[in-house]
Amino acid sequence: MGRNREFDIDQALEAALCVFWKKGYEGTSYTDLTQATGVERPALYSAFGNKEALFLRVLDRYYNHYHDFFPAALELPTSREVVARIFRGAAELQTRYPDHKGCLYVHGDLAGSDDAEPIRRALVNARAEGETSLRERFERAKQEGDLPENANSSVLAAFVMAVLHGMAVQAKAGFSRNMLEAVAEQALSTWPTGSSAQSGKSS
């Protein structure tokens, strides 16, 4: 019985992540998962619990291993640099793998059944956390003079998230990295600047 657990947990999570990334939560069957991981269903149950629990583990892995550019970008000195880095990171990630393009945060919950509600809620919460961290970063940018005093940090954060969502959808539809980066540059062309940013340009 114990031999059913003799597989590499990390490799199994990575394989499951790729399947969920490609097919979404409800589009992924246990057959898909067992074929991708090479692990029988009882062993998957034993190691991870049910499909929902496995997806939540995958979501953590996705953030830590693939979405790490997002928290790193928040440390950059100006809000424009923050957003530019996030857009570049998203464009690269969303087109990195031909077999599973787009973003797990966006495509993971494209489903309608009540059974998927906990997954939708987890993904909504993950996106909300990202938006909150952006809003807080933009508030700091206002205090530093990097953004205008009348800039609406909540609207700017929502704008960035909306662009990211659109990029993910377009990547899934086949847009190239170059096209996504061009879209990002267009979005950045409207980015507001505060007194400190303007004085830096003139000096």
Show the residue positions of the predicted features:
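Short hydrophobic clusters on alpha-helical segments that form packing/core surfaces
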Residues: 12, 16-20, 90, 164
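Hydrophobic alpha-helical segments that form the core
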Residues: 101, 106-107, 151-170, 183-190
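Hydrophobic alpha-helical connector segments
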Residues: 57, 71-101, 153-160
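Amphipathic alpha-helical segments used for helix-helix packing
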Residues: 82-83, 96-120
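Generic hydrophobic, amphipathic alpha-helix propensity
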Residues: 8-17, 33, 58-62, 66, ...
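Helix-turn-helix
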Residues: 11, 19-53, 57
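Amphipathic C-terminal alpha-helical segment
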Residues: 93-96, 140, 160-177, 190-198
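Amphipathic alpha-helical packing segments from all-alpha helical-bundle domains
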Residues: 117-143, 155, 182
